[in-house]
Amino acid sequence: MSEQNNNEMSFQIQRIYTKDVSFEAPNAPHVFQKDWQPEVKLDLDTASTQLADDVYEVVLRVTVTASLGEETAFLCEVQQGGIFSVGGIEGNQLAHCLGAYCPNILFPYARECITSLVSRGTFPQLNLAPVNFDALFMNYLQQQAGEGTEEHQDA
């Protein structure tokens, strides 16, 4: 009976926190004198670390770079962390939980932090669209499978 209880799936958020924040406006103040038609680039990255049995830290790194031509208007990076208890999940399900489900939870916090920093830099409001981490995770798995196939073909 206790074996069955140990295999039950469980998920709990222990903590969500800001791990690192950076905001740079290297070409201020003269960048404020230009027409605001920026090219905005969004980079996302996730990393997970096992802290204890069934306890994981997941860190979502979101970097936003806004450029006007060749000049960087601002560069904003947020590392949003979370500590999650994940029990009864292994293998691909655990990888999906840490690589997609947890980042989906963390992203709204990172987005709010970035929006606030950009606003404090007196730049026009930046609204980041929701991100489909499930699709990104599936793309990652497909890339990994493709690389594994290429390695076997080269051998």
From Swiss-Prot:
This protein's GO CC annotations: cytoplasm
Gene this protein is translated from: secB
This protein's UniProt keywords: Chaperone, Cytoplasm, Protein transport, Translocation, Transport
GO biological process: protein folding; protein tetramerization; protein transport
Assigned protein family: Belongs to the SecB family.
Keyword DNA damage: no
Protein name: Protein-export protein SecB
Subunit details: Homotetramer, a dimer of dimers. One homotetramer interacts with 1 SecA dimer.
Chain's role: One of the proteins required for the normal export of preproteins out of the cell cytoplasm. It is a molecular chaperone that binds to a subset of precursor proteins, maintaining them in a translocation-competent state. It also specifically binds to its receptor SecA.
InterPro entries: SecB, SecB-like_sf
Domain of life of the native organism: Bacteria
Organism annotation: Enterobacter sp. (strain 638)
Transmembrane regions listed in the UniProt entry: none
One example GO MF annotation: unfolded protein binding
Gene3D superfamilies: SecB-like
Annotated localization: Cytoplasm
